[in-house]
Curated annotation (Swiss-Prot):
Keyword field: Histidine metabolism, Hydrolase, Manganese, Metal-binding
Family membership: Belongs to the arginase family.
Binding-site residues, Mn(2+) 1: H129, D160, D164, D257
Function description: Catalyzes the conversion of N-formimidoyl-L-glutamate to L-glutamate and formamide.
PANTHER family in the record: ARGINASE/AGMATINASE, FORMIMIDOYLGLUTAMASE
Catalysed conversion reaction: N-formimidoyl-L-glutamate + H2O = formamide + L-glutamate
Organism per entry: Vibrio vulnificus (strain CMCP6)
Protein name from the UniProt record: Formimidoylglutamase
EC number assigned by the record: 3.5.3.8
Length: 336
């Protein structure tokens, strides 16, 4: 793999060490193993972490750049969190997108994801939300290589203030794939393959999406819930709808754009939310998804922008989300 796109495990994991507690004092930095992704099948079951250092898609979408620096800062915030699982984490390194080489970087990221999914689930640390096209492409490649006999029913669940259904090509304007286009790209791919497109977008902001994007979502039968409707008073109804969505799918891909949270909670994002959805209101939906660990194969966290963070609070939020997802994925083995 070209060194231009891939930095092999250069992050140095370190953190607090409580020697008096022995193995019971384990933290993430104690259990994470940096390995070559081609050797993942030789190791015990765990969860793989893969960085995607890229904000070329954000730049193309006319957003605030800075997300390229995020994977290692999420790792740093993750390193000191307590680790209770008997299963390890595997750090596969970071795919780096230099200049505007977005498509090539996405292909490299997808290749790595496809190669490790037969052995372990994957959490990708973005980067802008262009990571979603890389993540899904890797998942799709996995199914094409290992289960070509049947079209997979993949449920895509996106916590996001934006649909990210913008056009990725046009004869009337100079348009390229960006952080605003991944789910339109995914739908186009599914259509070409004859796969159903199951897309849920939770926390979408009516103020941040044009009428054209809402019409596109309706056209594609996207199940969405606006930010203002994710309050606790509506939890039971929307959780039931989420359960129906999950039941209709055989596999789940979870993607979290940190701009779904209020700017006061997540200031370090490419597009801060004036309203957003509180962590407390979002948590029951995340918990419901993680309860279906048998279906959850892939997740990513996107749009952390450390340039605008305050006291690393957005990094800590991203790390906690990663920690929650990784624990659920590792629990899969305990419940088999």
């Amino acid at each position: 793999m070209s060194k231009h796109f891939f930095l092999h495990n250069e992050f140095h994991w370190q953190g607090r060490h409580d020697a008096e507690d022995g193995a019971a004092g384990s933290r993430v930095h104690h259990v994470v193993q940096q390995i070559d992704y081609t050797h993942i099948g030789e190791n015990p079951y765990g969860v793989a972490l893969l960085g995607f250092a890229c904000d070329a898609g954000v730049a193309r979408n006319k957003g605030r750049i800075g997300a390229k620096k995020s994977p290692d800062l999420i790792r740093r915030a993750l390193a000191n969190l307590a680790w209770h699982s008997p299963h390890p984490l595997y750090d596969l390194g970071t795919v780096v997108c230099d200049d505007d080489l977005l498509e090539s970087s996405q292909q490299h990221c997808a290749k790595m994801i496809a190669e490790v999914l037969p052995s372990v689930p994957v959490i990708t640390l973005g980067g802008g939300h262009e990571v979603a096209w890389a993540s899904f492409s890797g998942l799709a490649r996995y199914f094409e290589q290992h289960h070509p006999e049947k079209a997979p029913k993949i449920g895509i669940i996106n916590f996001d203030a934006h649909f990210d259904l913008r056009a990725f090509s046009s004869s009337q304007a100079d348009i390229k794939p960006s952080s605003g286009t991944p789910f339109n790209q995914i739908q186009h791919y599914c259509q070409q393959q004859g796969w159903d497109f199951h897309y849920a977008c939770l926390g979408v902001s009516k103020a941040s999406n044009t009428r054209a994007l809402f019409e596109r979502a309706e056209q594609l039968n996207v199940w969405f819930v606006e930010d203002k409707d994710l309050g606790s008073v509506n939890h039971d109804y929307h959780l039931t709808q989420l359960q129906h969505f999950i039941d209709d799918c055989d596999y789940l891909y979870l993607t979290i754009d940190l701009d779904v949270f209020p700017a006061a909670t997540a200031p370090g994002v490419s597009a801060p939310a004036a309203r957003g959805v509180s962590y407390d209101n979002l948590a029951p939906f995340l918990d419901r998804i993680l309860a279906h660990r048998d279906k959850l194969m892939l997740a990513d966290i996107a749009e952390y922008n450390p340039t605008y963070d305050v006291d690393s609070q957005t990094a800590r939020l991203a790390a906690r989300l990663c920690w929650d997802i990784a624990n659920a994925m590792n629990d899969k083995l305990e419940h088999q």
